[in-house]
Curated annotation (Swiss-Prot):
Name the UniProt record assigns to this protein: 3-phenylpropionate/cinnamic acid dioxygenase subunit beta
NCBIfam families, per database record: 3PPDioc_HcaF, PRK10069.1
Reactions that this protein is recorded to catalyse: 3-phenylpropanoate + NADH + O2 + H(+) = 3-(cis-5,6-dihydroxycyclohexa-1,3-dien-1-yl)propanoate + NAD(+); (E)-cinnamate + NADH + O2 + H(+) = (2E)-3-(cis-5,6-dihydroxycyclohexa-1,3-dien-1-yl)prop-2-enoate + NAD(+)
Function: Part of the multicomponent 3-phenylpropionate dioxygenase. Converts 3-phenylpropionic acid (PP) and cinnamic acid (CI) into 3-phenylpropionate-dihydrodiol (PP-dihydrodiol) and cinnamic acid-dihydrodiol (CI-dihydrodiol), respectively.
Any Pfam family matching the protein: Ring_hydroxyl_B
Subunit structure: This dioxygenase system consists of four proteins: the two subunits of the hydroxylase component (HcaE and HcaF), a ferredoxin (HcaC) and a ferredoxin reductase (HcaD).
Amino acid sequence: MSAQVSLELHLRISQFLFHEASLLDDWKFRDWLAQLDEEIRYTMRTTVNAQTRDRRKGVQPPTTWIFNDTKDQLERRIARLETGMAWAEEPPSRTRHLISNCQISETDIPNVFAVRVNYLLYQAQKERDETFYVGTRFDKVRRLEDDNWRLLERDIVLDQAVITSHNLSVLF
């Protein structure tokens, strides 16, 4: 296991993640994009249910990408949301990103830190459409020379194997 970080560094990285979540909840997508590293990897795979005997053998069923985005692709997703023509987001969703169990450790790369958080993402739209997404995120954050932070990687793992939402237009 990699070395854990100091309490001060843990607080700084946690505050960066909380700020990033509030930008998404407030629909400040351009400000959120500014928090992303140019080399961002933003991924989510399908979740599959593996049999216990297969998991014991280390056998994992194949999965499919839901997201495998670069910064350019994320910019295009946001540009589409801004047009008012993204019908899945008319009227716009109200979201709340809750982050907990934040575990942060050093990596082999200087100024890059591995972060594991549990999340609950609540999405409400129209009068009765509500969706909860629950899972774990594996992030990598980079500390810049000016002591600011950038999100370098985000791997989103959903606990649910079946997504019951009408769309998957939210950002995690």
